[in-house]
Curated annotation (Swiss-Prot):
UniProt main location, coarse: cytoplasm
SUPFAM superfamilies listed in its UniProt record: Profilin (actin-binding protein)
Name of the protein: Profilin-5
Quaternary assembly: Occurs in many kinds of cells as a complex with monomeric actin in a 1:1 ratio.
Disulfide topology: C13-C118
Membrane-crossing residue ranges in chain numbering: none
Phosphothreonine PTM sites in chain numbering: T114
GO molecular function per UniProt: actin monomer binding
Keywords, comma-separated and alphabetical: Actin-binding, Allergen, Cytoplasm, Cytoskeleton, Disulfide bond, Phosphoprotein
Biological source species: Olea europaea (Common olive)
InterPro entries: PFN, PFN_euk, PFN_sf, Profilin_CS
A Pfam family: Profilin
């Protein structure tokens, strides 16, 4: 299965039980910042933004004072799982990032999708990739 198929079929899909509710944007990005696959709507990010995200996974709390930036959008960092999941909020939307052995799985959402639904979609794929050694 191609990486793009994972994004299209497992991240940008309808949320279970909620037809037409789906993430706004999604991507799978290598730890080095290389894009493996992304939705057409995923923002163009700067290398320093990806460096900040990777630093926060290695040093939890790094982004808390400045916020998480992706594609020029600033998200307030909210409760995540140290070294495994970063979550951010901006207005009625937000972002979930799950770290796997080789990649970061990104999901960006806006209402009516809820933070919990975004977390479920992103973390389910991230957990699957971890189980596959990726």
């Amino acid at each position: 299965m191609s990486w793009q198929t994972y994004v299209d079929d497992h991240l940008m899909c309808d949320i279970e039980g909620h037809e037409d509710h789906r993430l706004t944007a999604a991507a799978i990005v290598g730890h080095d910042g290389s894009v493996w696959a992304q939705s057409a709507t995923f923002p163009q990010f700067r290398p320093e933004e990806m460096n900040g995200i990777m630093t926060d996974f290695n040093e939890p709390g790094h982004l808390a004072p400045t916020g998480l930036h992706l594609g020029g959008t600033k998200y307030m960092v909210i409760q995540g799982e140290a070294g495994a999941v970063i979550r951010g909020k901006k207005g009625s939307g937000g972002i979930t990032i799950k770290k796997t052995g080789q990649a970061l799985v990104f999901g960006i959402y806006e209402e009516p999708v809820t933070p919990g639904q975004c977390n479920m979609v992103v973390e389910r794929l991230g957990d699957y990739l971890l189980e596959q050694g990726l």
